[in-house]
Amino acid sequence: MASHDQEAFLTAMQIVNSSAVDGVLICLIELNVFDIMMQKAGMDGYLHPDEIALNLPTKNPQAPEMLDRMLRILASHSIIKCKLVKKMSGNALLTRAYGLTLISQYFVNAQDGPCLAPYLKLIHHKQMQNSWEKVNEAVLEGGYAFNKAHAGSTFFEYLGKDKSVAELLSQTMAKSIPTSMNILLKSYKGFEGVKEVVDVGGAYAATLSCIISFNPHVKGINFDVPHVIKNAPSLPGITHVGGDMFESVPRGEAIVLQRVLHDWTDEESVKILKKCYEAIPDHGKVVIIEMIQTEMPEDDIIAKNISEMDIRMLLYTPGGKERTVNEFLMLGKQAGFPSSKYICGADLYGVVELYKKK
């Protein structure tokens, strides 16, 4: 064994215990603690655990102490803030009070803006968690972890059977997409001369709504499987269409694939792209919006997010993965597009355009 390094040991220990943080997060989200903090104290104020407990449906006298311990670990990771205040009751002169930060605001359930609470609920759903039990089996024997954990059903087949998981996925997309898309659309100007945009796999049209907000001249078609489309909200400038992208895609001047190809193998991605090729005019294009993997692992926050998402694809999808720019360009070539180009990247997303003509 290499020489002992205590700092390295403590870092390794923290990694082992890191699941305590997201475990606490999901508990507090389900208890609506972040919502209580927002409602009662806003972004600038603080609440004592006693005050939070008063807003929960509990008579447990230990609830404030338990909440304090849960909130304390989040404060140690700078997810929430903490300060010492005079206690409401009891013998201690000072005790801890907690407040929201720019990070923890994204765990408030009842807000119109971006929220990661549905995503955390999704990945902690028992039907998602059980994929971990099958990863090693998939590595050694082949196949896919989610399929093995669900009697052969793929993730997308399972969505048609479990409304709770399907709804969490749709909420996740609706609540998490706009933040990064709005940042990207400040740099990407590829829709300025386009009259009609088809968003393939658009769920509740979060991406298309962002595109139209930056390009109000655009007419939008939101295309997804029927069980998703039937719950999609009515939105100005957007027509919802149900169908199967492996069979056909609605015709449009530009077709958007936002976070779609990462769900599928290379072979299936090529099939999707071929259907898109058939649906665009000679002057049309396919706009791929995805997280872009680097060729070598990097340790900045965006690269870490992308690598972590790649593991989610390994867990849940039938062969999906995050790809590099060169891998996307190769998929376009295999699908018959004679010309393609990486356009730009901003925040988590990058854009690759595929053209029907050179």
Swiss-Prot record:
An annotated Gene Ontology molecular function: protein dimerization activity
Active-site residues annotated for this sequence: H262
Binding site for S-adenosyl-L-methionine: G201, D224, D244, M245, R259
EC number(s) stated in the UniProt entry for this protein: 2.1.1.279
UniProt entry tagged with the keyword Lipid metabolism: no
Record has Iron as a keyword: no
UniProt xrefs under InterPro entries: COMT-like, O_MeTrfase_dom, Plant_O-MeTrfase_dimerisation, SAM-dependent_MTases_sf, WH-like_DNA-bd_sf, WH_DNA-bd_sf
Other remarks in the entry: The phenylpropene trans-anethole imparts the characteristic sweet aroma of anise seeds and leaves.
Protein name per Swiss-Prot or TrEMBL: Trans-anol O-methyltransferase 1
Originating organism: Pimpinella anisum
